[in-house]
UniProtKB/Swiss-Prot annotation:
NCBIfam families: thiE (TIGR00693). It comes from Pseudomonas putida (strain GB-1). Its cofactor is Mg(2+). Condenses 4-methyl-5-(beta-hydroxyethyl)thiazole monophosphate (THZ-P) and 2-methyl-4-amino-5-hydroxymethyl pyrimidine pyrophosphate (HMP-PP) to form thiamine monophosphate (TMP). Transmembrane segments: none annotated. Mg(2+) binds at D68, D86. SUPFAM superfamilies: Thiamin phosphate synthase. The keyword DNA-binding does not apply. GO terms for biological process: thiamine biosynthetic process; thiamine diphosphate biosynthetic process. This is Thiamine-phosphate synthase. Binds 1 Mg(2+) ion per subunit.
């Protein structure tokens, strides 16, 4: 599977009361990867929401990933995204199998990206590139890093951190394969606007 396009990431608080409807609206607009991100300790709700997302992703032909929970990913038979504090990647690869999509947060570090590649990552994620509501204190990255990563790391490159339709184009131009977006997509006032934004993000890859 070619990893290129919009990488939608959920936020359960942002999407409260409209979780599945807005996610489906995004999928209708075109989503390459969908990451279920929920940092709460409510395991039952997380399983229920993840199962709902899995059904939607199957309907739209989108790959689902779970943030920071390889065991839940294994239970559902989907991929996982791991941050630098979420444990090593190799055990997750062993647990999920060779075909699973596994992503790794690399902040602004080519060294972390090289390590992730050596451990079997499917893609590497750099950021934050702009001011981020979700992770305001994350290390900053810039477009020069993307060109260096393109030359050194032979994996798809995801970018994250404050990405909107107003600032995403230069990231794609400098080598980003995946635009990982939370508020810039799901912060829309209506499901119709979520769909419009999803299509607009994907259009950046067609130009």
């Amino acid at each position: 599977m070619k990893l290129r396009g919009l990488y939608a990431i959920t936020d359960s608080q942002l999407l409260a009361g409209r979780f599945l409807s807005h996610v489906e609206a995004a999928l209708d607009g075109g989503v390459c990867l969908l990451q279920y991100r929920d940092k709460s300790d409510d395991a039952a709700r997380r399983l229920r929401e993840a199962e709902g997302l899995m059904k939607l992703c199957e309907r739209y032909g989108t790959q689902l990933l779970i943030n920071d929970d390889a065991e839940l990913a294994a239970r559902l038979g989907v991929g996982v995204h791991l941050g630098q504090t979420d444990g090593p990647l190799t055990p997750a690869r062993t647990l999920l199998g060779r075909q699973a999509i596994i992503g790794s947060t690399c902040h602004a570090s080519l060294e972390l990206a090289a390590q992730a590649a050596s451990e079997g990552a499917s893609y590497v994620a750099f950021g934050r590139f702009f001011n981020s509501v979700t992770k305001p204190g994350a290390p900053a990255a810039n477009v020069d890093l993307l060109e260096q990563a393109r030359a050194q790391v032979k994996l798809p490159i995801a970018v994250i951190g404050g990405i909107t339709l107003d600032n995403a184009a230069p990231l794609v131009a400098h080598g980003a394969d995946l635009l990982a977006v939370i508020h810039g997509l799901f912060g829309a006032d209506s499901a119709q606007e979520v769909t419009r934004r999803a299509r607009a993000f994907n259009a950046l890859f067609a130009s």
